[in-house]
Design a protein with these regions (language model features):
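Active-site/ligand-binding neighborhood in enzyme catalytic cores
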Residues: 58-61, 65-66, 70-199, 206, ...
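A structural signal for the main folded, soluble domain(s) of proteins
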Residues: 3, 123-124, 260
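A residue-level signal for conserved active-site and pocket-lining positions in enzyme catalytic cores
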Residues: 48, 94, 111, 177, ...
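Dinucleotide-binding Rossmann-like beta1-alpha1 core, especially the glycine-rich loop
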Residues: 1-81, 132
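Mid-domain catalytic core of redox enzymes
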Residues: 192-316
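Short solvent-exposed loop/turn micro-motifs enriched in small/polar/acidic residues
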Residues: 28, 35-37, 190, 254, ...
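A broad structural signal for alpha-helix termini and local helix breaks/kinks
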Residues: 2-5, 98, 115, 237
Length: 318
C-alpha cells in the first residue's frame, strides 16, 4: 500500500545515520505516502533501571541485576530446565521458558496489570502466541549467532532490530487501505449495526442487512469483512447455532486506555550509544514492569516517525 522510502528521513539526515533506502522510492522529506525503515529499540523499565526487551546477555544486564540476583536468575533457569511444569496455564509456560525468578521480575505483575488476570488464570497458548518461541535458550542462540556472525540465522520476531512504519503513523496505512478498497469497487460502511446474514442454498453468504441512522438496508457482495469484536458480530447474527453463540458470548475482552501527552522533555537519561534528536532515550516502546506504578507501557513517537511531531527539536510525544 505504501512504497518504501527512497531517501533518508529528517532525523537520519540530522544525525547522519545510515538506514536502508529503496532505489526509486519516494523521498519522505517531500512526499507523505511512504513507508519508513526504523531502528527498533524496546526496553524494560524495572526498579528504575533499563533492561533490553527481551532480556539480553549484556554486561549492563548483569550490572543492573547485581551478583545475588544474577545467581538467583541463573539457578532458577537451570531448575526450570530439569523440572518442567505442566504447561496448563501461562504462569507455568513462562516459568518453563525463563525460570521462576525472571518470571516473577518481568512477567507476573506486568501480565496481570495489562490483562487484568493473573497468569495462572490464562491459557498457556496465549504465551506461545505472545513470545513466538522466545526463551532463555533462544536468547542464548541469538547472542552467540551475533558473536560469531552466523549467516542466515533465524531471528525470532521479538529480537528483530528494524521495522517498517508509515510516515504519518498507523492511521495513515488504514486511510490508504480504505481508499484503495473503494478505488477497486469495494464499499466501506461505518457506524452501522449488522442485524441479519443471508445465505444461498449452498450455505454461502450472499448479502446482509444492517441498520444505520434508524433505517434498515440490505447489501449484496462477494466478500464481507467485519471490524467489530467477534462477540458482538456473532451476537448480531440471526441464525448462529447454540454452541458457537454460547462460546462467542463468553469471550472476555480487556479494554485499555491510550493517552497521548506532549511534553517539553522526559526525565529519562539516554545512556546508550544511539544518537537521537535532542538526545532523548531511543526507545520505541518502554515496558513498565515496576510494581510501584499502574502503567503498562508507553511509546515515544519521536522515535517512530519524526514527521508525527510538529516541533521535534523541543517536544516529546508519549
Amino acid at each position: 500500500m505504501l512504497p518504501m522510502q527512497g531517501a533518508p528521513t529528517y532525523d537520519d539526515i540530522v544525525l547522519k545515520r545510515e538506514m536502508p533506502v529503496h532505489k526509486g522510492g519516494p523521498d519522505p522529506e517531500k512526499e507523505d505516502r511512504v513507508m519508513l525503515t526504523r531502528h527498533r529499540v524496546s526496553r524494560i523499565l524495572f526498579d528504575t533501571k533499563f533492561y533490553d526487551y527481551p532480556i539480553s546477555l549484556k554486561p549492563e544486564t548483569f550490572k543492573n541485576f547485581g551478583v545475588l540476583t544474577t545467581l538467583r536468575v541463573g539457578f532458577s533457569y537451570l531448575g526450570s530446565m530439569f523440572h518442567k511444569l505442566p504447561e496448563d496455564n501461562l504462569e507455568n509456560f513462562y516459568i518453563n521458558c525463563f525460570g521462576r525468578k525472571l518470571y516473577s521480575m518481568f512477567f507476573e505483575y506486568y501480565t496481570e496489570n495489562l490483562w487484568g488476570r493473573h497468569p495462572s488464570e490464562i491459557d498457556a497458548s496465549w504465551g506461545a502466541q505472545r513470545t513466538k518461541g522466545l526463551s532463555i535458550m533462544g536468547i542464548l542462540k541469538d547472542f552467540f549467532g551475533k558473536l560469531f556472525k552466523v549467516k542466515n540465522r533465524k531471528v525470532n520476531t521479538s529480537l528483530i532490530e528494524e521495522f517498517k512504519y508509515p510516515k504519518l503513523g498507523p492511521g495513515q496505512l488504514w486511510d490508504v487501505t480504505a481508499a484503495e478498497v473503494e478505488k477497486l469497487g469495494g464499499t466501506i460502511i461505518k457506524n452501522a449495526k449488522v442485524t441479519k446474514l443471508h445465505k444461498n442454498a449452498d450455505n454461502v453468504l450472499t448479502s446482509l442487512t444492517y441498520e444505520k441512522d434508524g433505517q434498515e438496508f440490505t447489501m449484496e457482495g462477494d466478500y464481507f469483512i467485519s471490524s467489530m469484536p467477534v462477540k458482538d458480530l456473532v451476537g448480531g447474527m440471526n441464525d448462529v447455532p447454540a454452541e458457537p453463540a454460547r462460546i462467542a458470548k463468553g469471550l472476555p475482552y480487556r479494554d485499555y486506555m491510550t493517552l497521548g501527552v506532549l511534553v517539553p522533555k522526559i526525565n529519562l537519561v539516554n545512556k546508550t550509544n544511539i544518537k537521537t534528536i535532542n538526545n532523548i532515550v531511543p526507545d520505541c516502546w518502554v515496558y513498565v514492569q515496576d510494581r510501584n506504578v499502574k502503567l503498562g507501557r508507553f511509546q515515544i513517537y519521536n522515535n517512530w516517525s519524526p514527521y508525527m511531531i510538529k516541533d521535534l527539536e523541543h517536544t516529546v510525544w508519549i
